């Protein structure tokens, strides 16, 4: 079964863990580059989807770059409405491949990350990340795709799973996220192998705190 992973540097951190946990029954592909923000991912799909074999399953996320505060005067890098518009378009293009789609919520940052103002490095606020997660989940509510709630699993003990840079996962975080992604992929793969005529797949790891 062929799997395509799409995302930013968080995806790049957990990629090897996903490959290890999926084993030889799955071929895992991903762009070599960082998927960055939603508009960049949307534009890049024109090239990425031609670069790899047609996938059976696609697991994707964008959001950390979109919620980044590059300059304190400007707020989030992309407005939530533009983020949602881009994510809808990304989902449309991914669905057109015929693959089973899994969407992952954006992961939290350390509470201290808000204090890093200015152009380098950007600041993030968990309230913004949660707000963008809610917005995209509301937009995807009728799309009938599984949700892998990485935010919900990581947020309660985020400091345990974050590295010193306060945004990327440490070893424990890689194990957590990689395990969740691999498990979601296996469950969707098994589900559709056994019930290929079913109308919908179950939601995965969905935490109510994300959408409140």
Task: Please give the residue ranges for each predicted region.
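Short, flexible loop segments at the rims of nucleotide/cofactor-binding pockets, characterized by
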Residues: 5-8, 34-37, 79-80, 124-125
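The conserved SAM/SAH-binding core of class I Rossmann-like methyltransferase domains
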Residues: 6, 31, 104
């Amino acid at each position: 079964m062929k799997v395509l992973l799409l995302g930013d540097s968080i995806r790049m951190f957990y990629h090897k863990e996903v490959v290890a946990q999926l084993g030889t029954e799955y071929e895992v592909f991903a762009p070599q580059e960082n998927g960055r923000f939603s508009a960049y991912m949307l534009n890049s799909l024109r090239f990425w989807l031609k670069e790899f074999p047609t996938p059976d399953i696609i697991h994707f996320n964008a959001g950390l770059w979109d919620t980044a505060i590059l300059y304190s005067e400007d707020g989030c890098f992309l407005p939530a409405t533009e983020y949602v518009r881009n994510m809808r378009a990304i989902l449309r293009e991914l669905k057109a491949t015929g693959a089973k789609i899994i969407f992952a919520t954006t992961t939290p940052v350390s509470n201290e990350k808000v204090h890093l103002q200015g152009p380098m490095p950007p600041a993030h606020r968990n309230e913004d990340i949660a707000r963008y997660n809610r917005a995209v989940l509301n937009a995807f509510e009728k799309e009938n795709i599984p949700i892998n709630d990485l935010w919900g699993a990581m947020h309660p003990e985020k400091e345990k799973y974050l590295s010193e840079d306060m945004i990327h996962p440490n070893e424990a975080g890689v194990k957590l996220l990689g395990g969740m992604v691999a498990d979601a992929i296996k469950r969707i793969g098994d589900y559709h192998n056994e019930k290929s005529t079913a109308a919908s797949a179950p939601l995965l790891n969905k935490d109510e705190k994300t959408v409140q």
